[in-house]
Amino acid sequence: MMKKIISVLLALAVLLTLFASCGGRQDKYADSLRIGTTALPKNLNPYSSTASSSTFFVSLFYDTILGSDATPVGYEEGVTYTFPDGSVYTPVDTAKNPLSFTDGLLEAAGALPKEEGSLYGYEYFDPTEEQWAEQCKRESIQFGIDETGNEIVETEEEFMARALIAVPKTNWMRFRFKVVDGHSWNDGTPFTAEDIKFSLDYIIKHAGSFGSQAYFLTDYYSSEVVDGDLVFTLASNNYTSMKAICNSIVILPKHIWETIRNPAKEKNLSPVGTGAYYIAEGDYIEDSTITATLRSDYDAALLAKMFAGDPIQNISVILMSNEDVLINALREGSIDLMMDSVKPSKAYAVANNSAYDAVEICAVNSDFVTTLLFNVGPYGAFRDGGFNGYSEEIRQAISLCLDQELLISEVLHGMGVEVGDCLVQDYYAHAYVDENGEYVYHKTDVDAANALLDTTSYKMDANGSRGIDLTVFATPDNEVTVKAIASQLHKIGITIHYDQATSTYADDIKQQNHADFDMIINSVTFTADKLMMYSARYGVYPNDGGVRLFNYSGIVDETLIEMISEMELAADTAEQYALCREVQKYIADLYIELPLFAENTITFYTSQKWDGWVEVEGSSIWNSYSIRYLHEIGA
């Protein structure tokens, strides 16, 4: 009997301990904005970890050189848009500020043309022979040696021709920026322009570890600190590359990272940053929770810019086992936001189930365009001369047959937008337009597609087949897309087969591996603000004509290469954008990459505890506006 009593008492003690633990955990999150995720980061290194959960925390702890204006969903030009606090949205004047920069660690005026009498802004200059030669060396452009280090035979004229493609000799850009007052590191160390210079040079020094960051600095030449200001030199006039440099690279504290010799292995679990939040001791609990706390020493003026009312004191990110657990936690109100983005099928299921009425869905336009890309390389079925010489006609017929509206309905449950054959979405100011100034959408005409194929040697037989069997290489996530494409192409007598790829299939289709796929489901992020992406996706290496890293199609088109080069070397941004439209049109007419749709970015949240969420074009519900206007209900 006594043993039974002791057992019961022990069980009760365990239960009380568990309840106390849960209660303590709930109390800890009581004043927090609670965010659920299926993956907590084990690494907060802002340069080596690209997991979405890591990126989320990096945005809390670190700042970029400049900010960027964001357009709230629902804003229409000429119509007043009012934020939750009654303030009015004023868009950036893109005629003066084409990349929509705002202040960050530095003042945005430094990224605009220098006005007479001002120290700040940019100006053009021609580099010295020494500067030009130094940049060529950085780009591995050397006489008699190709980019891979192999010796080649070339004349001075041939060397100069390929060198000038990589490094122009005229119209470099020099910027001067003023540091924004108030920023400091969360360990109390003052922030200076030296930290920015250090960060940029550190990335270049460790380019092998920070490849994606180093890619943003392709045109970077040097920076220096002059009287407390940052003077930054771009080894080209490719102004649009400043978008990635200023908005994508977070700045590290020199006094911390200059002692780190192997940065790729640095987990950085107690980050020292200029952001408004930090991780207090004991608030990083591996495989459980990470809580970010508002800095008590954060500058009052910067805090007022960040928050319209009382600031969010704590942000707790809580690990949960799977997507469905997260969604139910939102429904019950035990978390406020789901960090993970979801597929349209999941959003459709939630939207059509009344049990989840408390779960709100944010589905907004994204920069990503899903495409069907043909292999026109030397080992691809669509190479020159392929299909009895009818490769282009077949590609064009497939383009005409594809119905984007139907794909968006069937694959995305309506949660996406159409895209023009230029691969750039219509809401970008510099997307391709026709002679009337109207955006050119993708054209669907099945009859015209069949008529075009009837001019080839591939005639339709009694069974409705033309004997054209093609394979689409795609990841499991895109299997439903392939099946939808197959259903549409059946109308023109083309049979499509699905070939499953791994999530890292990009490594398998690079041209140096002699890719022999027919087609792949690809994703591109073409926007007019990312002109440098065109060269990466359609360019070739100057010395041997080998295709560049992301040129999965294998295309080698001298006209396109010249057009891209002319665009990148244009004298000013307005001319670059004008030439960009011509490049877009030329790419559309090649029929080597066909747009399917632009899938919405979809996130779930709830307003049961926190209200003031603001949706932003091209972003999730977690953005600077939501941070600014969120307030605890009843507080």
Please give the residue ranges for each predicted region.
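Surface-exposed binding/hinge segments that line
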Residues: 176-178, 197, 212-261, 265, ...
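Ligand-site clamp/hinge motif
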Residues: 179, 265, 300-349, 495
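Alpha-helical secondary-structure segments
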Residues: 34, 192-201, 229-231, 276, ...
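Append "and occasionally in soluble cytosolic enzymes with long acidic Gly/Pro-rich linkers
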Residues: 88-90, 95-98, 102-123, 137-138, ...
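Detector for C-terminal structural segments
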Residues: 49-57, 289, 397-434, 477-486, ...
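A structural "hinge/loop" feature
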Residues: 37-63, 76-86, 94-97, 102, ...
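Gly/Pro-rich hinge or "lid" segments in bacterial periplasmic/extracellular proteins
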Residues: 246-314, 324, 447, 451, ...
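N-terminal lobe/hinge region of extracytoplasmic solute-binding protein
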Residues: 36-167, 272
